[in-house]
Curated annotation (Swiss-Prot):
Name the UniProt record assigns to this protein: Protein ABHD13
GO terms, molecular function: palmitoyl-(protein) hydrolase activity
GO cellular component entries: cytoplasm; dendrite cytoplasm; membrane
PANTHER family linked to this entry: ALPHA/BETA HYDROLASE DOMAIN-CONTAINING PROTEIN (PTHR12277), PROTEIN ABHD13 (PTHR12277:SF81)
Organism for this UniProt entry: Mus musculus
Main location: membrane
Residues annotated as the enzyme's active site: S193, D268, H298
Topology within the bilayer: Single-pass type II membrane protein
Carbohydrate-modified residues: N299
Pfam families: Abhydrolase_1
EC number: 3.-.-.-
């Protein structure tokens, strides 16, 4: 009995010693962690906050950028032009998405030879909401217009994404090129805001099929816009892979050597007008124009006096040139209207 008690006593002392040694080891191991957190805990916390914000922004970038459901009826009702020759068209993209287009025809003098403008709108709404602007283009510029609703907008299928919008723009250009009643040598691109980024991408990939590009109140890139809109966070230090949508127009503009018109409203409260000036300066086009409207806001620059005159002069200049990309003289001009 005594031997048994001595055995259990030995085991108890051994377990206590082991526990004491383990606790000492744990304290030694925890000490560096405690010291590190004490010294750098604020930095670690900031990093965690930074990573969390980046994750949230990545997840909700589509929601913050596209707004296809605004206004609330945008996906249910698309207004159509009345009393004007037009076609309500549906086409398929390379990845099988069904898109809705409206082709508005100019029927005046020399209509078979008039230019065609592919119109890329900004975020929110649908092509029907852009008809007042488009119809004034029709009357003042004497052009055909093809308005496109990107995937996820209006009556088009799918969900909006950067690559998706690029595929949509390619599909529209391909469709225009199949129309025997449209002059393929006079295809102009027009893009406002988000549509400007789509137009720049399409032009950078199809310089041989596009006569000229016109962009209005658009941005350098989504990372640039994030730094502007969320200036209270160090967004400029986020690596590019953190952005689900990039729209790197400031890079792609270097591939747009066709005649280019940059339209800037200096009263734009959403996209800094300096971005339009920077795109103009980055453009390698031999014929580039910057039309500045001091009272122009983000969405309503087209209502400024002299707006359609600037577009008309640019289009006429391009058409008069036999080969816009091979002009012998470099011509750049800034017009304040």
């Amino acid at each position: 009995m005594e031997k048994s008690w001595m055995l259990w006593s030995f085991i108890e002392r051994w377990l206590l010693a082991l526990a004491s040694w383990s606790w000492a080891l744990c304290r030694i191991s925890l000490l560096p962690l405690i010291v590190t957190f004490h010294l750098y805990g604020g930095i670690v916390l900031l990093l965690l906050i930074f990573v969390s914000i980046a994750g949230i922004l990545y997840k909700f970038q589509d929601v913050l950028l596209y707004f296809p459901e605004q206004p609330s009826s945008s996906r249910l009702y698309v207004p159509m032009p009345t009393g004007i020759p037009h076609e309500n068209i549906f086409i398929r993209t390379k990845d099988g998405v069904r898109l809705n287009l409206i082709l508005v025809r100019y029927t005046g003098d020399n209509s078979p030879y008039c230019p065609t403008i592919i119109y890329f709108h900004g975020n929110a709404g649908n092509i029907g909401h852009r008809l007042p602007n488009a119809l004034l283009m029709l009357v003042n510029l004497r052009v055909n217009l093809v308005l496109v609703d990107y995937r996820g907008y209006g009556k088009s299928e799918g969900e909006a994404s950067e690559e998706g919008l690029y595929l949509d723009s390619e599909a529209v250009l391909d469709y225009v090129m199949t129309r025997p009643d449209l002059d393929k040598t006079k295809v102009f691109l027009f893009g406002r805001s988000l549509g400007g980024a789509v137009a720049i991408h399409l032009a950078s990939e199809n310089s041989h099929r596009i006569s000229a590009i016109m962009v209005e109140n658009t941005f350098l890139s989504i990372p640039h816009m994030a730094s502007t809109l969320f200036s209270f966070f160090p967004m400029r230090y986020l690596p590019l892979w953190c952005y689900k949508n990039k729209f790197l127009s400031y890079r792609k503009i270097s591939q747009c050597r066709m005649p280019s018109l940059f339209i800037s409203g200096l009263s734009d409260q959403l996209i800094p007008p300096v971005m339009m000036k920077q795109l103009y300066e980055l453009s390698p086009s031999r014929t580039k124009r910057l039309a500045i409207f001091p009272d122009g806001t983000h969405n309503d620059t087209w209502q400024c006096q002299g707006y359609f005159t600037a577009l008309e002069q640019f289009i006429k200049e391009v058409i008069k040139s036999h080969s816009p990309e091979d002009m012998t003289k470099t011509s750049s001009n800034v017009t304040i209207i």
